Swiss-Prot record:
InterPro entries: Rbsml_uS13_C, Ribosomal_uS13, Ribosomal_uS13-like_H2TH, Ribosomal_uS13_bac-type, Ribosomal_uS13_CS. Residues 91-118 are annotated as: Disordered. Pfam families: Ribosomal_S13 (PF00416). The gene is rpsM. Keywords: Ribonucleoprotein, Ribosomal protein, RNA-binding, rRNA-binding, tRNA-binding. This is Small ribosomal subunit protein uS13. One of its GO terms (molecular function) is tRNA binding.
Length: 118
């Protein structure tokens, strides 16, 4: 099992799919990484040589992925909350941020219903 960006990527899958196991890399970016590293996307990870895995590591290192990306996203949300912007207030209150309706639905963001006490 190859280890790239601190993640064990599955070796029984194609390189394109295996790279998506890394947080911050989707199929499009995985394809771009394979192209820049000069590796066919339909090759399985276990078929790659050590030199090819090193080239993949070098290409992945050019992007912000895993812990750094998670930290960056968390800091962006914290910044919005500290500014007191509308989006920050919605994050703080645990409500939908992107304009969805809340009169009905939005249960995922709001959590389970609380009964009204009389």
């Amino acid at each position: 099992m190859a280890r790239i960006a601190g993640v064990n990527i599955p070796d029984h899958k194609h390189v394109l799919i295996s790279l998506t196991a890394i947080y911050g890399i989707g199929r499009t970016r995985a394809g771009l990484i394979c192209k820049n590293a000069g590796i066919e996307t339909d090759k399985k990870v276990r078929e790659l040589s050590d030199e090819q895995v090193e080239r993949l590591r070098g290409e992945v290192a050019k992007f912000v992925v895993e812990g750094d990306l998670r930290r960056e996203v968390a800091m962006n949300i914290k910044r919005l909350m500290d500014l007191g912007s509308y989006r920050g207030m919605r994050h703080r209150r645990g409500l939908p941020v992107r304009g969805q309706r809340t009169r009905t639905n939005a249960r995922t963001r709001k959590g389970p219903r609380r009964p009204i006490k009389k």
